[in-house]
Amino acid sequence: MSVLMAAMPIPALAQGFDPSLLLKPRTDSWPTYHGDYSGKRHSGLTQITPENVHRLGLAWSFQTGLNIPIKASPILANGIVYLTAPDNIWAIDVRTGRQIWRYTYPMNEGFHIGHRGAAVYKDSVFLTTPDAHMIALDARTGTVRWNIEIADSKRGYWSTNAPLLVRNHLLVGVSGDFDNLPGILKSIDPETGKTQWVFYSTPPPDTSDPTSGGATGGQMWMTGTYDPELNLVFVGTGNPTPVLNGAARLGDNPWTCSIVAINPDSGKLVWGFQASPHDTHDWDAAEVPVLVDANFRGTPRKMLMQASRNGYFFVLDRTDGKNLLTVPFATVNWTSGIDKMGRPIPNPAKDPAPDGRLIAPNEVGGTNYRSPSFDPKSGLFIVSAQDGYGIYFFKPEHGAYGWAGADYGVAGKAVLRAIDYQSGKIKWNHDLGDGAGTAGVLTTESGVTFTGDTAGNVLALRTADGATLWHSGIGRVGNSPITYELDGRQYVLVAGASGLYAFVLPEERQ
């Protein structure tokens, strides 16, 4: 463990972050992974407009010094930006871009695939580690307060998760595709690090559930969302294991590839909706469950929307999980229809086979971890999508354990796609380049959408039609930009390659 502090004043976090502000975040903050509990990644700020966004310039930049891409979304609380990468977190002064402190986790044998972000509570900041620990640090100095094991990394668990704080519950999930492990979500006391409850998406060890078909998996590796009125947390779950050998786990395999609604005080399941019953293609439904309160075809609804990795867009009533809409938003060829519950019906002819099957989407999916955004004014759900194909092989010699096969992507095209949530129709597409995109999406009330392309540009588009308004080459954008207001000026903050960049309009001359 190491902490490096700069000799500079520490901003206002000395007073600590008030967790009640997560219910209505201030405009000078982005205090949680999604910005607020809804997952919409939409800002009410309007200073940057389609008419002036071309004037954006660099206010400051920060370089991590690491030769790894940043996949985290920064958070901002009380004047401090927190940026993460595997084994690392930086505290950065939002006014200057200067490092306040850096914490480096000891070397470990965990899986260093990426990291999504941090969480704050009072005067602590929390991050997960590649060996499936969670650490509480003093938000002012970066010194360790406690360090707990979320799950056993020696069994094959790891974590990239940005924790979700709900009152005094710190909710955190893990990953683990390479072994037959149950999916877990834990609630941790942010003061002590003690476990409050554990939710299993598939049966825990030494138990059985006849509905599971023997499946394990269903890891909850992405940050969920929360409805304080319903007091429900919504989380997407990952694929079943063995991943490509469906014959070893007959049936639908609940609750893998699902959206689950959980009571944050008890950890009890309230309802579940399965986006990919009996998945055999590694299509997690871990993507962000976006919460929207609006009319749906003339009726006021509390909705949940998800663009899922399997290529389908879902609209649910989040009070009970009932399906309102299921439509494809990316190229798909693996289904034979939609069942009466609104779930895609897998076509057995598209299961992986020893001689290979050409499937769309490919393993990367119709989308992935990169966050979408919902723009309430236009009613558009905007998502970084991919139209792609892959060849899937089931390898009998691998048996019924872990991956149990292989897949090879053969074609893919990245595109930003705007979906009308009422009908599921695509309103516009914006070409992002070849392969799969890595950037998430941010929309603003003024009608600007921010994202990134595969060529290493951060983009500003007109939300109404997807037209390009501005771009800057900062390196590959690995998650969603954020925005905030400081001293009367609106900033856009985005991670590109291994750095962080703050953009702002020129100051008006007096």
Language model features: what each stretch is:
Residues 293, 385-387, 408-467:
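Loop/turn-rich, solvent-exposed surfaces of beta-rich toroidal or solenoidal domains
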